[in-house]
Amino acid sequence: MQDFIRIHEDDNVAVALRPIAPGENLTVGQYQVTVGEEIPQGHKFALKPIAKGEEVIKYGFRIGYAKEDVAAGGWVHVHNLKTALGDLLEYQYEPVASG
């Protein structure tokens, strides 16, 4: 089983597919990451240092901005991520029919 997933090649975060312990070394594409803190399953961690105010990229798109500096291997969550969704938090799910 894979330990993480990087959804898009432009992402600067990956998602833990299991709890990841501090000190674990992971290779994510071209990034060598030593995890700095407990990363809960389903949560994001930085693949490279992300400076305060820098965009956080997931799915190949900006999902928010770092509220503080985040080290490579650091947990990226509500405590250090400001959403880029704006004040409007409504959306309509419209699945695309396949084939």
Predicted feature locations:
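N-terminal small-residue-enriched
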Residues: 1-99
